[in-house]
Amino acid sequence: MMRELLRNLIEDKTVINYKKWWMECKDAQETKLLAILCFYDIDDLPEETTAGLDKFVLDKLRVLSLLSLCELSTEVNYQEIKEKCDLKTDGEVEKLLIRAELFVDLKIDSVARRATVLEYKISRDVYSGEKGVPFHTPVRSKINILSALINWRSSLTD
């Protein structure tokens, strides 16, 4: 059973960083859930894993997945958001965009069905190999970020 602290962290709309608790957690099930919230997006997870998550965890994971998508591009269309966040309707997309505005300033264009990132307020956790993760190495890992920066620097000198 999920401890009350973890439940409160998941239900708190202002919390998106869980690494501190993941590092300290001793319970295997809770550690796995915290790793998912720290480092993965909803589309990274096996279907049997997402099927076992409750509504609050899925809602939080959708916000986190949207933030990951916003890190990749300053403009995202509704279809990309639906695919990345496992949503069905434009109404669900717009509700998610509004919830994400705690963490990123967005310009939402309902007619063009896209959102433009104006400013990032906070970023998601980054995996640095502190301890094992339940699935593949997360995209937001220290190694991947350093590699991307090296490639970017090389592209500037070419």
From Swiss-Prot:
Domain of life (superkingdom): Eukaryota
Annotated localization: Cytoplasm; Nucleus
Biological processes annotated in GO: protein deneddylation
Domain PCI: 5-119
Main location per the UniProt record: cytoplasm
Annotated Gene Ontology cellular component terms: COP9 signalosome; cytoplasm
Keywords (A to Z) from UniProt: Cytoplasm, Nucleus, Signalosome
Protein function: Component of the COP9 signalosome (CSN) complex that acts as a regulator of the ubiquitin (Ubl) conjugation pathway by mediating the deneddylation of the cullin subunit of SCF-type E3 ubiquitin-protein ligase complexes. The complex is involved in the regulation of the mating pheromone response.
Subunit note: Component of a COP9 signalosome-like (CSN) complex.
Record-given protein name: COP9 signalosome complex subunit 9
Biological source species: Kluyveromyces lactis (strain ATCC 8585 / CBS 2359 / DSM 70799 / NBRC 1267 / NRRL Y-1140 / WM37) (Yeast)
Taxonomic lineage from the root: Eukaryota, Fungi, Dikarya, Ascomycota, Saccharomycotina
Gene that produces this protein: CSN9
